[in-house]
Every structure is written in structure tokens, then in C-alpha cells.
């Protein structure tokens, strides 16, 4: 499994290759915040003043650093993304692949950045900045957002394009009469039980987004003394849905904690028409060498 040391080496190489003051400043700040790949609105404003650039120009300059977080043992193809929240915060994302598992377990960079922002408490994404044109899977995933109609996509070669330009005549949650969509506040009530890690899994399951299957699902990881959670984000097209273990592993990686050992994994699911138990158990065993503790609530 790639280590934090490998991430640091990649970033150092990018800094040397780019020889760009923005890249250097971003890398320095990442090191100061222990490689937690989220930047406050205040930090973003400071850089915009310092380098006399817009939010989008700043995010475009950040892409080579964001791509350093990629985990790509299969493709060796590094994709970096920056989701800009309506709060003004920047959230990095990167693609992640898992050996010895079905390729459907892959995390796309746009999914990574969006899930990162969602778990961090962001309320909407205004802009998605990415170093390669979004694939159809990601275009459909972004169409689930509460900001889908106004979301702008920015690439190194083309900026200020609305999502609908990449996904004309789209199919989405409104076609299935879903009013509260991804990033809208969800209100579900699940009974708490068990120890703190189990309770965390239940609480994060209650915050998941599953309007089609009604199968709420959450994961809690014991990472040293910290609990890191991930939750399910469903999609109107079903296949682009984002699974809770990927969500948790992604958040751990982007929090700069990929070196910290995971000692336990708890999954909580409500009884619905689907289950992510088997896929999550397979990934937990092959990628982490751990048994997944499962509860139905």
C-alpha cells in the first residue's frame, strides 16, 4: 500500500518539475497541515491576493499536487481534481484503484473530491476543476448534485463550461421525482447501539443518500485514536453510486492518514432492497487484511 512517504516524494518531484510559486506555496501549506488536502476559504483568499489570480486559476495550478494523491496500481494514470465549495473552500480529489478487486471498486477523481467535500460538511459545489475531461461515469455522478444545473467544469484547456454541456439531455434525480438530492440535508433516524465505533457507523449511515434503494449505509474506521467515517451516495443511474468503504478510505487518504493503521472496520446498513456488504467485505480483506464487522439497523 502506498505510504505517506511516497506521497511526499511525489509532491517534492512536482514542486521541482513545475518550479511554480503557487505549486510551491500549496505544497508548503500541505506539509504544515500534515497533508490534509482541504484548504480553508481564508487560505484560498490569501493565495488569490498573493498570486493575483482567480479561484479557478488557483485550482488549475493545484491540479498537479492533487494528482499526487492518486493510487493507480492498475492504470498508472494520475487524475487530480479540485472541488470548489460555495463556502470558498478547496477540496482535493484523486483517482484510486485497488488490486485484486473488480474494477468497479475504483474511485474516480471527481467522486473523490465530491465525497471529500460532502464528508467535510460542505453544502454545495460550485466548480469542479480537473486535469482530464470527465468521463461519462463522472458526468452522471455530478448530475446528482444539488448544484448540477449551475456547476461549472474547468479543464487546463477549457474553462467555464456548464455540466449540462458535457451531459446534454441528461437523466437525473428529477426524472425519478427526487426533490432532496446529494448535498441537500438528509434526515434519517436510525437507533444507536454498540460501542463508539459502531455508533459512528450508524450515525454516518443515517446521513447517507439513498433515495432510490432506501438502503442507508455507512462505514466507520478505527484509525489510531481517530474514527474516520464514509457514507453511501446513490445515483439515479445506479452504477455511478459511491460506496461507503471507498468514501471512508478516500477521506482517510485525503486527510493525510494513509500511514496510520486501521484496526477495525464497522459497517451499518438499514434493511433495504440492496446491500453493499459483500463488496465491502471483499475490499476490506484484500486491501486492508481486515474482517468487516457488520450490523443491520
Curated annotation (Swiss-Prot):
GO terms for biological process: cytidine deamination. Homodimer. Keywords: Hydrolase, Metal-binding, Zinc. The active site is at residue 110. It is an enzyme of class 3 (hydrolase). CDD domains: cytidine_deaminase (cd01283). The gene is cdd. One of its GO terms (cellular component) is cytosol. Binds 1 zinc ion. It comes from Actinobacillus pleuropneumoniae serotype 5b (strain L20). One of its GO terms (molecular function) is cytidine deaminase activity. This enzyme scavenges exogenous and endogenous cytidine and 2'-deoxycytidine for UMP synthesis. This is Cytidine deaminase. Residues 54-174, 192-297 form the CMP/dCMP-type deaminase domain. Substrate binds at residues 95-97. Its EC number is 3.5.4.5. Disulfide bonds: none annotated. Zn(2+) binds at residues 108, 135, 138. InterPro entries: APOBEC/CMP_deaminase_Zn-bd (IPR016192), CMP_dCMP_dom (IPR002125), Cyd/dCyd_deaminase_Zn-bd (IPR013171), Cyt/Deoxycyt_deaminase (IPR050202), Cytidine_deaminase-like (IPR016193), Cytidine_deaminase_bacteria (IPR020797). It catalyses: cytidine + H2O + H(+) = uridine + NH4(+); 2'-deoxycytidine + H2O + H(+) = 2'-deoxyuridine + NH4(+).
